[in-house]
Amino acid sequence: MSKVEERSLVKLNVEADVATIILNRPKVRNALNRQLMIDLIDIAQSVSDHEDIRSVVFASEGKDFSVGADLKEVSGMDPSGSLLRARRDAELGRKLLTTIKNIHQPTICAVKGVATGGGACIAAACDFRIASQTARIGLGEVKVGMNLMWNAVPLFVELLGLSRAKRLIMSGDLLGAETLEQWGLLDEVCSDTELETLAAQWARQYADLPPIAVQMIKRSVNQYALALSEAVMHMDEDQWILAARSDDFKECVGAFVEKRTPKPTGF
């Protein structure tokens, strides 16, 4: 089977039994706006439901995997608006990560350039992560006055352990691929020119295994590792509603859009 499906913001390429889902906003470094996330959820669910697909790769057009949420879109949101609307906006990211985590087939994320915020969260939601040696990954929400949402905290704690998860989430720093391979977030690092080939090798390795056994094992491991995730998932939205109404959030996002240094006050 060979199939190519292309929406304006997400592309799907299916070759034989391997599907590749490609983020396609290279002009804005694959920033995640609402429509891209909706398209990504739809395509990921469609791929998961396809019994002929044995493994799935997440990749990207352009130099970066994804710089996370489109802050220009976020800056246009009315923080004083409906609480229900604010919660629903926040729930979309959680739905995206849940959809990716629940894809039946093994998933491999191929990271190049920068993967920060929501981009890093998409990578964490996959089963395996490979990266080019110049890739950098981080969670910059704290630097714009936001909490880490999308029910991603349990993922990073499970992958990194408590101390390193705090360091990545609370610092907002971008860390290099070799460091994150040592930490356990990345499974393998390669040269920039070898990333696509390495992703295909990982996908083939898992596509060639008995699919029923592989998919049952994946589900069992995820259920065990993330058993408490559902219990705390609503904290993200509650914290977001508070953060989005703070003066610091308005100042930090405004500074990002205006390309100046923010001056947070703690209010």
For each feature predicted by the language model, list its residue ranges.
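Crotonase-fold acyl-CoA enzyme core
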Residues: 98-212, 246, 251
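Amphipathic alpha-helical segments at domain termini/boundaries
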Residues: 1-24, 173-207, 215-225, 252-267
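Short loop-to-helix capping motifs
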Residues: 25-26, 50, 209, 246, ...
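Conserved CoA-thioester-binding segment of acyl-CoA-metabolizing enzymes
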Residues: 1-61, 98
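Catalytic-core regions built around general acid/base machinery
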Residues: 43, 92-103
